[in-house]
Regions:
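Hydrophobic alpha-helical hairpins/lids featuring a short glycine-rich hinge
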Residues: 2-40
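Short loop/turn segments that connect beta-strands within beta-propeller blades
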Residues: 30-34, 41, 81-84, 126-130, ...
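Short loop/turn segments immediately following the C-termini of beta-strands
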Residues: 22, 71-72, 119, 163, ...
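Extracytoplasmic beta-rich repeat domains
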Residues: 1-11, 39-61, 73-74, 90-111, ...
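Repetitive beta-architecture junctions, highlighting loop-to-beta-strand starts
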Residues: 24, 75, 112, 120, ...
Length: 257
C-alpha cells in the first residue's frame, strides 16, 4: 500500500477518538489533548493482509470492544479492549485479505452479530466469543472465478434490513441478498443480480427498493432501482457518471463523481 496515513472515518466514543492507518496501525487519541493513549500495530501483530490500496475500514466500538478486520492466515477479525488495545478474542482465519469495506453490527432475534465482507466471503461473527457463525461465498453465488489472491476490490458496507443483508461490489461483480435464519446463526442466498454492481457510492433502501449506481467503468455508471425482495431491476437510468446516494425528507439525492 502507498497510503500509510488514516484513510477511514474516525470513530468517536465520548472524548476518545479511534483511527486506523492505511497499514492497519490502530490508535486511541485523547480528543481534548490530542495525545495518543495507546496504539497497536494490529495488521503486523496478527499477520494481517490487505489489498493494494491499504486499510480503509472505519472502526466499530461496541461496549468495551473495538472491532478490526485483519485478514490473513492467523485470523479474519479481532476484538480488542477499547481502553487498552489488548486482545479480547480473534476469529478463525478465512485465508483471504481484508477488503476495503466497513462492517456492520446488528441485533437479530436476540443475537448480536458483526457482519463484514472479504474478497471472497460475506461472514457473520458472534461478538460474544468471536466464532464465525456463517460465511457466504459471494464469488461462487455470482458465478465468478476466484483468482486465489483475493484481489476483488470491494468497498461498499453491507446493508441490513429485517432478516436480510445486501452485499454489492463493482467491477462487474454484482449483488447478493443473504437471508438470515435461526437467530442469525444460519445464512443462505435469497437472490443475486449481476447488473447491480455498486462501486464506491453506497446504497439506500427506501420503501422496499434499493437505490445506487452500477459500474460500467471507473468513469461511468448508471443510476439504478432494485426490488429489495426479488432482486429485479426496476429501472436503470443512463447517466454520465456513477456516484453516491442518500435519502432525506422524502427525497433521494444523487451525487455524481
Amino acid at each position: 500500500a502507498s497510503h500509510p496515513e488514516s484513510r477511514c472515518s474516525p470513530t468517536v466514543d465520548g472524548d476518545k477518538i479511534y483511527v486506523s492507518s492505511g497499514f492497519g496501525d490502530l490508535a486511541c487519541i485523547d480528543g481534548n489533548a490530542g495525545n495518543i493513549l495507546w496504539s497497536l500495530k494490529a495488521s503486523e501483530t496478527y499477520k494481517g493482509t490487505y489489498g493494494s490500496w491499504g486499510i480503509a475500514e472505519s472502526l466499530i466500538i461496541d461496549g468495551e470492544k473495538l472491532y478490526f478486520t485483519t485478514g490473513g492466515l492467523e485470523t479474519m477479525t479481532i476484538a480488542i479492549n477499547k481502553k487498552t488495545g489488548e486482545l479480547i478474542w480473534k476469529t478463525e482465519s478465512l485465508n483471504v485479505p481484508a477488503s476495503y469495506s466497513s462492517p456492520i453490527l446488528l441485533n437479530y432475534e436476540g443475537y448480536r452479530l458483526l457482519v463484514n465482507v472479504s474478497p471472497v466471503y460475506v461472514y457473520g461473527v458472534d461478538v460474544t466469543n468471536g466464532s464465525i457463525l456463517w460465511k457466504i461465498n459471494h464469488m461462487e453465488a455470482l458465478g465468478k472465478e476466484d483468482d486465489g489472491k483475493g484481489s476483488q476490490i470491494l468497498c461498499v458496507t453491507p446493508l441490513w434490513h429485517n432478516n436480510k443483508i445486501l452485499f454489492t461490489g463493482g467491477y462487474n461483480h454484482g449483488s447478493v441478498m443473504i437471508d438470515l435464519t435461526d437467530n442469525g446463526k444460519k445464512a443462505s442466498v435469497a437472490w443475486t443480480n449481476t447488473d447491480f454492481d455498486v462501486h464506491h457510492g453506497g446504497v439506500v433502501l427506501v420503501d422496499g427498493y434499493i437505490y445506487g449506481s452500477n459500474w460500467i467503468n471507473n468513469g461511468n455508471g448508471n443510476w439504478c432501482c432494485v426490488d429489495w425482495n426479488t432482486g429485479k431491476m426496476m429501472w436503470e437510468e443512463q447517466w454520465k457518471c456513477k456516484g453516491s446516494v442518500i435519502f432525506a425528507d422524502g427525497m433521494i439525492y444523487l451525487y455524481e463523481e
